[in-house]
Amino acid sequence: MRHHQNMHYAPQQQPVYVQQPPPRRESGGCCRTCCHFLCCLCLINLCCDVF
């Protein structure tokens, strides 16, 4: 049964869509500041307000 095996092993012509998180521009505005790393981790919330 070549037909059955062929369907199982189909050439992947469709582009593989990698699930990437949407760019958080509004939610993570502080991420653009100097303390982007700490702000993104929600460790220093004051950093966002100061800068």
Curated annotation (Swiss-Prot):
It comes from the Eukaryota. Coiled coil: none annotated. Signal peptide: none annotated. The keyword Cell membrane applies. Palmitoylated near the C-terminus. Disulfide bonds: none annotated. It is a lipid-anchor. Residues 1-28 are annotated as: Disordered. GO terms for cellular component: cell periphery; plasma membrane; vacuolar membrane. InterPro entries: CYSTM_dom. Keywords: Cell membrane, Lipoprotein, Membrane. It is found in: Cell membrane. Pfam families: CYSTM. The keyword Hydrolase does not apply. Belongs to the CYSTM1 family. Present with 861 molecules/cell in log phase SD medium. This is Lipid-anchored plasma membrane protein CPP3. The gene is CPP3.
